[in-house]
Amino acid sequence: MMMAALGSGIDVASLSITYNGAYTDYGMVTMSDGARYRLLAFTSSGTLSIEQPVNCEVCIVGGGANGNHGVGGAGGYLKNQAIADYSGGAVVVSAAQGASSIGGVSVNAVSGESGGTGGGGHNDVWGPGSGDGKSKYPFDDDSYEFWAGKPHCAGGAGGGYFSANNGKYAGGNGGTDGGSGGGATEGSPNGGTGGVYGGGNGGIGSSYGQNSGSNATYYGSGGGGYGDGNGVTGSNGSGYQGIVYARIPVIQ
């Protein structure tokens, strides 16, 4: 991400930065591109104030979708973008199925099975969702230590399905890293496995209960779909909130 230079004289490490929501200032870090940045992560909405205008890069993650009709919820959208001459303002960190934003840059909200990453299917009627095919690692950096092996925005899995008249279907697995969800397969009423990282698992298709989808557990990931056993259903799992990152390069 290229930005026009602001010129020398900005000491990024000692720059005064305040925020009235929940956030973490990791200080100066070296990321996988070998460059040094001041890294910030915002986990609730608030107002950001930076002592001097800076060039920075942001990563915006929307909330994941809830499971729906036994289908896994979609993972949220993720967007990386450079912002020049930025001194702060409103930061919106969305709950499940919401849109996050910073500096006039935002991502769309998701609901249902399709979005940033697809949710798994439930049966032959309620199929899987599709993803957008884009990396779900902040700043396209899949090896940085804070999130290595943890792509954001995983899809939730589909719940299992059992019907005395229409057979058994195992719920499809949730998608990972911008991929589509898996389709349901005949033969078993088991729930699918949530996508990596933190997508909710699908519920079991059982008429004896224990068939609710599980909630997502990582930023932007979708909830698992309920299991359906002869019309006995549990609840769909909930999607997980979004997050917003900002990194300020030491070289301005």
Regions found by a protein language model. Give the residues of each.
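Low-complexity, glycine/proline-biased repetitive segments and flexible coils/loops
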Residues: M3-V12, I17-S49, N55-Q252
